[in-house]
Amino acid sequence: MNTYFNCHSHTMYSNIRLLDCINRPKDLIKTAKELGLCGIAITDHECLSSHMEVNKFAKSLQETDPNFTIALGNEIYLTDDRESNQKYYHFILIAKDGIGHKALRELSSIAWNNSYVDRRMERVPTLKSELKEIVNKYKGHLIATTACIGGELGTLILQLHECELVNDMTNASVYYQ
């Protein structure tokens, strides 16, 4: 078996607010196994709805392949505040255990309870201050990582790269703070 573990994948449950993915959880997991991965994390876009289905399927897999790991996570949208016309940075959280999953549920509930419409789309951001509070409350039970090019780190790297391409580093100091 391969030692590669996919820690960022989406299922059809990511479509709760936008059309993003057509993968059924079972099919995604089966494909990961067929590819020889050692595990996969389900990290839908601010949605934990697939987790019950995934857990049920994971239990059936344990009998045939106890070494294959399925992790439950969430791709949240990080912001400093809840104002319109801002960037909603993608950020991955993965539960290490049941306590970590409780933290995911708590953060998701806060985000959905404070959702609002911005640019004709329902937004469900997690404030950085809320993330910090929950991470401290459930210290050691979550894995956190940048998500994709839509994450804050990816965005900053791209912006810095653009400054380098046009040989104009006057704005680059913003990225080194």
Model features per residue range: what roles?
Residues 1-177:
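Phosphodiester-processing cores and adjacent nucleic acid-binding clamps
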